[in-house]
């Protein structure tokens, strides 16, 4: 019985995305997460473009990830529609803009996510896909630099946690 519990624990731990703050200074930081999914690079690429199906609702402005879209082409928008409040107009947020779209290999966005937009920060958000035994290895990286009130190093662990959570959402969605 103990052998089976240990095996289950090891499987659970290995299934979680490996995340880490790689570097952190008052003027910037780099975070990276990795996960292997049981999907082809083509299937993984397509799911990146269906971001509203796997991004966490709690990390949106509208409260619904279904309001998000990500166009998988250079110049494409990583945007969120904001529903109208009462009789007022609807709104929108550009979370990022696609800089590089290399199908099945790499997607890079200029994306000062969330609270970084109101700081003097630049953010590069990328996913690299590599065929691996039984699926695809995804490396998700976010690099930010510039001025942040109180220091960017204070933001690094928060961004790392939030983005690792999104990679887990992508992994879960691809497992269906």
What are these model-derived regions, one by one?
Residues 17-69, 73:
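Hydrophobic ligand-binding cavity/cleft-lining segments
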Residues 33-35, 67-68, 93-100, 123-131:
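Hydrophobic/aromatic beta-strand elements that line small-molecule binding cavities or substrate pockets
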Residues 38-43, 72-73, 99-106, 128-137, ...:
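A short, structured loop/turn motif at beta-sheet edges
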Residues 7-14:
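Bacterial N-terminal signal peptides
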Residues 53, 65-113, 176:
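Glycine-rich portal/gate segments that line the openings of hydrophobic small-molecule binding cavities
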Residues 1-6:
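Bacterial N-terminal signal peptides that target proteins for export
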Residues 35-42, 88-89, 119, 153-164:
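Soluble non-cytosolic domains of exported or imported proteins
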Residues 114-161:
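Beta-strand/loop substructures that line and gate deep hydrophobic ligand-binding cavities in soluble
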């Amino acid at each position: 019985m103990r052998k089976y519990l240990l095996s289950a624990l090891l499987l659970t731990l290995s299934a979680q995305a490996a995340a880490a703050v790689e570097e952190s200074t008052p003027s910037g930081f780099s975070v990276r997460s990795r996960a292997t999914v049981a999907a082809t690079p083509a299937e993984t690429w397509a799911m990146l473009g269906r971001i509203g199906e796997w991004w966490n609702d709690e990390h949106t402005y509208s409260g619904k990830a279904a309001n998000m879209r990500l166009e998988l082409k250079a110049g494409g928008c990583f945007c969120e529609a904001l529903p109208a409040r009462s009789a007022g107009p609807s709104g929108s947020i550009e979370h990022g803009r696609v800089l590089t779209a290399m199908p099945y290999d790499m997607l890079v966005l200029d994306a000062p996510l969330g609270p970084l937009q109101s700081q003097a920060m630049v953010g590069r958000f990328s996913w690299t896909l590599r065929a691996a035994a039984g699926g695809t290895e995804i490396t998700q990286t976010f690099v930010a630099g510039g001025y942040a009130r109180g220091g960017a190093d204070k933001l690094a662990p928060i961004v790392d946690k939030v983005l690792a959570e999104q990679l887990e959402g992508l992994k879960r969605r691809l497992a269906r």
